[in-house]
Amino acid sequence: DGRASDFAWTNPPKVDDTSSYAKLKLHLAYILTIPGVPVIYYGDEIGMTGASDPDNRRMMRFDDDLNENEKQTFKDVSKIIHIRKNHPALRYGDFLTLKADKNIYAYVRSDMNERVLVVVNKNSNNQKVEFILPGIYKVNKAKDLISGGEFTIKDNKIVLDVDGTKYIILKLEK
């Protein structure tokens, strides 16, 4: 009689755990800052869910049809895309891994004009991390490209507190 399909159509898949939005943003920050061409499937920029085929994704929703988590996800992802667009090292630069363990992945993207340090924390707990940057960098401060905050680098060492399931994108400066 079609009732099951009517139910599915009027009750689209939803995000069960709101921590999924933070995980999605962490993933998108990663793919937008590593080498290669980032691919974002439509709706990922808002955390849109899907179900099994043929209900992979519904029609795209905009503005007033988004919940607060989706609006914030879109805002945060847009900011990362803007950072990628305005910092060529994130698109074309060399890649140097500084740390890779079960919780933290940190790397620097460098070109002839700038160096950008990216730190992703996949753990749900805050992590204090310390990095010794290559001496050739000759940098003494870092600017957070998300918040605008500044960090001091002394003797090529930078210490950061990274919130749980978060990322930091820093421009290294002289």
Locate the predicted segments by residue:
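Active-site and adjacent substrate-binding regions of carbohydrate-active enzymes
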Residues: 1-174
